[in-house]
């Protein structure tokens, strides 16, 4: 997310770190680089102009205390203005209805149907509530089939009637949700190839009938600045409460995220970060700005760890590390928990200063992880608890059982030995373990 833009901005800001004073002369080239980076990321020209003017004005007008590095102050100004550009503060969902209703709208191809399933999954996991999906796209049978399939995958009920009146379907779905004690109703409306009066009239009728707590517009981030016109077109007819930006995980410039709030006054509430059904994140401007500038996102990292890692198991492993008893059984357990967190390269990007440490470009081959797991599982419990007993004949057996080579078994044992030594140093130095 925002990787290309982040690289450009970080490179530009790196140049001011050593300056003893901020002057118009020594920041002019850097401001030009920031301007170009934003424009090339497809940020709206008007937004770029206002952003750079504000940053420059604040930087030159700040009284710098002797204890503060001017370069650090400039970076703080840039970050604060980025946060403001992205929406200032995160805007929570209004879920006060009984049941609360959320209406998702958008053009065809924006990822609306997949997004509504992701959102239902998000609400169920994060808030432990019972969601109901509603199929109101009666013009595309494939859309109803897709929603039913997604609902089946997630074990979330999909309400559909097969009628041709989406307003009636939405109304009946609310009554059904009340009768069956559903907490949230998520309405998947019909998409169009472009905004037209027929689409808008239908959406307005659903809105007037259901009176949803949230009306979220799903937008493909790869649309670039055309997305602004789409948001404006919908917002002229419907009181949008938020935007969901999809496909921010792909090779997209992401500039629309920096333009939406400033130009339309509609907040970004969610972003799609992967194609998986758990690939939807609540949008937080402060965290997003930190990630753009390479400051990491520790809060997200902790949240992911809290969701995925078994606390008791982690405490048990930590205790064994501190006692110097960490073995391959513990290693296997730890690896399985780390796998739950998602791709390791994505986690590394959340660590502050990861780019400077050169760890953001690390590529972890899933096949290699599978080989490691197979090797450890091919050992006997005794061998996992006492790796020192694994000699030549045992290595040959383990390699054959795991479909790998003796060289790979040797490599794993060497890496495990290095890891144990490192852990011993950490615990001797009273360093806290990251879980």
Which sequence ranges carry the predicted segments?
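Primarily NTPase-proximal linker/entry elements flanking Walker-type ATP/GTP-binding cores
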Residues: 9-136, 143-163, 169-179, 183-189
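Residue-level signature of catalytic and energy-coupling elements of molecular machines
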Residues: 16, 42, 78, 107, ...
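Conserved Walker B
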Residues: 138-139, 163, 189-191, 221-222, ...
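Short, glycine/polar-rich helix-capping loops at beta-to-alpha or helix-loop-helix junctions
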Residues: 141-147, 227-230
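Generic secondary-structure signature for well-ordered alpha-helical cores
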Residues: 36-40, 57-60, 83, 87, ...
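Long amphipathic alpha-helical segments used for membrane anchoring, targeting, substrate engagement
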Residues: 2-19, 189, 287-435
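Conserved phosphate-handling catalytic cores of large alpha/beta enzymes
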Residues: 170-174, 182, 194, 198-208, ...
């Amino acid at each position: 997310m925002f990787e290309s833009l982040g690289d450009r901005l970080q490179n530009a800001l790196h140049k001011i770190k050593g300056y003893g004073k901020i002057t118009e002369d020594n920041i002019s080239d850097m401001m030009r680089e920031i301007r170009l980076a934003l424009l090339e990321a497809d940020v709206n020209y008007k937004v770029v102009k206002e952003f750079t003017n504000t940053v420059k004005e604040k930087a030159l007008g700040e009284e710098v205390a002797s204890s503060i590095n001017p370069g650090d102050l400039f970076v703080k100004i840039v970050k604060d203005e980025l946060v403001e550009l992205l929406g200032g503060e995160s805007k929570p969902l209004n879920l006060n209805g009984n049941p609360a209703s959320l209406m998702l709208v958008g053009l065809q191809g924006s990822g609306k149907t997949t997004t509504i399933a992701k959102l239902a999954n998000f609400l169920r996991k994060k808030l432990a509530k019972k969601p109901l999906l509603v199929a109101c796209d009666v013009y595309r049978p494939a859309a109803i089939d897709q929603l039913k399939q997604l609902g089946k995958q997630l074990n979330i009920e999909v309400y559909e009637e097969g009628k041709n009146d989406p307003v009636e379907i939405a109304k009946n779905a609310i009554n059904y949700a009340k009768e069956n004690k559903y907490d949230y109703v998520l309405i998947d409306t019909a998409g169009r190839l472009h905004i037209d009066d027929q689409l808008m009239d239908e959406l307005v009728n659903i809105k007037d009938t259901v009176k949803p707590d949230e009306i979220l517009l799903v937008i493909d981030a790869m649309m670039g600045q055309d997305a602004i016109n789409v948001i404006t077109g919908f917002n002229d007819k419907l009181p949008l409460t938020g935007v969901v930006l999809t496909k921010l995980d792909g090779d997209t410039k992401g500039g629309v995220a920096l333009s939406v709030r400033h130009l339309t006054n509609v907040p970004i509430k969610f972003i799609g970060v992967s194609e998986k059904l758990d690939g939807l994140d609540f949008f937080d401007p402060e965290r997003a700005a930190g990630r753009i500038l390479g400051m990491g996102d520790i809060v997200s990292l902790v949240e992911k760890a809290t969701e995925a890692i078994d606390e008791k198991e982690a405490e048990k492993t930590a205790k064994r590390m501190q006692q110097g008893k960490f073995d391959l059984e513990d290693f296997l357990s730890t690896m399985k928990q780390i796998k739950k967190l998602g791709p390791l390269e994505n986690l590394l990007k959340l660590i502050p200063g990861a780019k400077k440490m050169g760890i953001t470009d690390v590529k972890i081959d899933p096949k290699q992880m599978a080989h490691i797991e197979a090797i450890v599982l091919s050992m006997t419990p005794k061998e996992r608890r006492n790796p020192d007993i694994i000699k030549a004949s045992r290595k040959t057996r383990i390699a054959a059982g795991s479909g790998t080579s003796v060289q790979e078994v040797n490599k794993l044992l060497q890496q495990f030995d290095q890891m144990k030594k490192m852990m011993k140093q950490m615990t001797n130095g009273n360093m806290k373990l990251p879980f």
